[in-house]
Amino acid sequence: VAGIVVDFEEFGYRSRVLIVNTNRIELSEAPKSIKDLVSRKWKNKVAMAYPLFGTTATHILALKEAWGSEIWESWCEGLVANKTKIVDGNSMVVRLVGAGEALLGLTDSDDLAVGLSQQLPLASIPLENELCAIPNTVAMVKDAPHSEGAMSFINYVQREEILADLVENSALISAKLPPEENAFQSIFWPGILAEEKESFSFLRDTFLR
């Protein structure tokens, strides 16, 4: 974004979550790692959004950086071989798992919150070392024609009472940035971007067959 935006800010965060249908799975029987999603035990029982877009893409690319290419490619191919349900978005993952059409799903914390507000039988599995925190970001485009209005908005969304409302309504997990001990805080994002074209080519070939 260098040279494109100015006044780039980070505030608060959501997170990726692995969810389960609590009517169908005891939490003690749930996977201990997202690497287990390729196990035959979970064949045709896992849902996730297309890994080419949005937070799912961010998470999947971060896993490549964390695990290395060989393990990551094998895991992605394993998801396909295990007949993972690839759907149009994170909210659809919540609906499928809530309805029992899938037993497990990768989604976002705010989508899970919506499902819980609808009394769906859902819970998340604490796998912080494998689940990507998603800081909120806001920025103004360089030479924006309405820079004063843009700056007013940037300041507004970071006001303490606005952040408190976002947390209260589960749009954010916290008004603060993710804790430093979160494994994905140390991910080398320039490395991810350097391999982005190659990574997306692999994902298209793997998931869009």
Stretch-by-stretch model annotation:
Residues 14, 44-51, 75-80, 86-87, 118-144, 156-177:
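Periplasmic-binding protein-like
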Residues 1-101:
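Extracytoplasmic ligand-binding site segments that recognize negatively charged/polar headgroups
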Residues 1-6, 114-126:
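Ligand-binding "clamshell"
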Residues 17-24, 134-149, 165:
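A bilobed periplasmic-binding-protein/Venus flytrap-type ligand-binding module shared by bacterial periplasmic
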Residues 24-26, 44, 52-56, 110-113, ...:
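Solvent-exposed loop/turn segments at secondary-structure junctions
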